[in-house]
A protein has these predicted regions:
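Active-site-adjacent mobile loop/cap segments within catalytic or ligand-binding domains
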Residues: 68, 109-120, 145-197
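Active-site/substrate-binding loop(s) of hydrolase catalytic cores
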Residues: 1-135, 139-143, 166-173
Length: 197
């Protein structure tokens, strides 16, 4: 199973635009997407923080909490509901979560990844994915910043709770909209090809 989430932080809309392009590509109903969806279930959460968005908050929800710091504590309803739904879906379908991507925005395009890869179900996925992105997106250089997840953030939860590859996929605030569509589309195509290989 693959999990895609976005809008934990309300104003980070360029990440949401990449999420839309990514998800639309997966649901494209062509041979590649059909084969991928035959093999993998995708759970997509397009608005993790509806109250924060509605209230115009910068990083937190209606309770004043940054949702991307609650992924092992589960004090916030948004995270608890999401985690419960993912867990229920995995159990009902006897599935395994292999990849989780959390779309955000920041000053520039960057992928925040976990240093730990060997213990995941796809230890070479990121290397293959990033190599593919650089070869398919014109003038694109992957900016990866791996770290050990010490805070209760989504990428750490994907790794620690499920041994899945976890990525925080950040799009630059000023990345042009047409470029975001290309990056989102090519990222999804590359992911599907790698995971079907």
């Amino acid at each position: 199973m693959v999990v895609l989430i976005t809008r934990q932080h309300p104003p980070e809309v360029t990440g949401y635009f990449a999420f839309k392009s990514y998800l639309s590509t997966i649901l494209n109903e062509n041979n590649l997407s059909s084969a991928f969806l035959e093999k993998y279930r995708v759970l997509a959460f397009p608005l993790m923080n509806p109250d924060g968005v509605d209230l115009g908050h910068w990083r937190h929800n209606a309770g004043g909490i940054d949702l991307n710091r609650d992924w092992s504590v589960y004090n916030q309803k948004e995270i608890k509901t999401t985690v419960d739904f993912i867990s229920k879906t995995l159990k009902e379908n006897d599935s395994k979560l292999v990849l989780g991507i959390d779309f955000h925005s920041t000053y520039y395009d960057v992928f925040y990844t976990n240093e730990e890869r060997a213990s995941t179900s796809m230890p070479y996925f990121l290397d293959n994915w990033f190599s593919s992105l650089e070869s398919t997106i014109p003038n694109y250089k992957v900016n990866e910043q791996p770290s050990v997840s010490k805070q209760p953030v989504s990428k750490g939860w994907f790794l620690n709770a499920h041994k899945a590859v976890g990525v925080v996929y950040e799009i630059g605030d000023d990345t042009p909209r047409d470029r975001i569509k290309i990056i989102g589309k090519e990222s999804a195509i590359s992911m599907m090809k790698i995971m079907l290989d």
